[in-house]
Amino acid sequence: MKKLRRSSLSEDAYTFVRALFLKGDRYSPGDKISVEELSRELGVSRTPLWGAIYRLEAEGIVEIVPRLGVYLVDYDPKKVIEIYVAREALEGVAARLAAERITERQIAALQANIDLQRAHLKQGEIDKYYAAALDFHEEIVAIAGSKTIGRLLGSIFAQIKAMRVQRNYAPMHLPQSCDDHERLLAEFRRRNPETAEHEARRHIRDLADEIRRSLPERAISSPRARGRAVVS
């Protein structure tokens, strides 16, 4: 594993470890993470690594269980739906704000993004489609101009990336998502905050419904639950 540079260790550790956890190659949902092992591999002290871990806990990517350690969060069905309920509310407000301030250049950029999404789907490039679709949503949040909403949705988007790796979602109605994006963009062109919020919320609600149908109806043990068993 590549060792980190001595300058800006805290930010480098956060960036590296976040990417490592989201990628899904090394850790599986619910796995315990050894901070000591990562410290040796990266050639840094545990202090910047713990700083990164605390930030990732705030984002909902890891769970710190007292006296037991750090675990990669396992997204059970209930947690997944909770995340999408929050996403619906926040993206609805972001769309409303974006409709009030969006420029013609930004509209053109969003249209180009949708065209890219459709091109990726046509080529069967599902991972690239997901990346472009997330860029679309992130750009709307940026246009909205709210740092608070941006920070909260940044955490949610990170968790969605992790869920996609963990659950290996199968593509089902992705062309419909592109159509939803087109409808939302149409409301931006009209500079209509109310209907933009409506379209954004409906789109996220439809995604949540599809995910709800695809998730298994089973309880997945959390690190905290496993911890109680270990303690007893």
Predicted regions and their residues:
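C-terminal-biased regions
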Residues: 26-27, 31, 35, 55, ...
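Alpha-helix N-cap/N′ positions at the starts of helices
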Residues: 33, 67, 90, 109-112, ...
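Short linear motifs at protein or domain termini
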Residues: 1-96, 100, 212-232
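Juxtamembrane/interface motifs at transmembrane-helix termini
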Residues: 5, 50, 101-104, 128-131, ...
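Conserved amphipathic alpha-helical segments that form helical-bundle/coiled-coil interaction surfaces
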Residues: 79, 83, 104-165, 179-187, ...
